[in-house]
Amino acid sequence: MNLIETLEQEEIARLGKIIPEFAPGDTVVVSVNVVEGARKRVQAYEGVVIAKRNRGLNSAFTVRKISSGEGVERTFQTYSPLIAAIEVKRRGDVRRAKLYYLRDRSGKSARIKEKLPARKIKTAAV
């Protein structure tokens, strides 16, 4: 590991942010700190993760939602101080790392199958 990677790892540890495990296809709620004049409030942004970029401190992810019938995408820096919290609502079962094809789809064709937790297999007693 080189010096820059070491410094980035130290900075991530110093930030102490709790980032849940999520992947493309998952539906997440990102709580964003919004400053309007002197007021500061938290705004929730819920949508499907269509891309994730893992680059240490420069990691980012893109969330897509449909707002008033129009597709809206927003890219968030994972370790940004503007992000208050990230909550995973549901796990999506997809076979791609980047879900850019969802941009061309709407309605039922844009649905993502839910990933169900693995069932425990009972072994026969011998």
UniProtKB/Swiss-Prot annotation:
It comes from the Bacteria. Pfam families: Ribosomal_L19. One of its GO terms (cellular component) is cytosolic large ribosomal subunit. GO terms for biological process: translation. Keywords: Ribonucleoprotein, Ribosomal protein. Gene3D superfamilies: 2.30.30.790. One of its GO terms (molecular function) is structural constituent of ribosome. Transmembrane segments: none annotated. This protein is located at the 30S-50S ribosomal subunit interface and may play a role in the structure and function of the aminoacyl-tRNA binding site. Belongs to the bacterial ribosomal protein bL19 family. This is Large ribosomal subunit protein bL19. It comes from Albidiferax ferrireducens (strain ATCC BAA-621 / DSM 15236 / T118) (Rhodoferax ferrireducens).
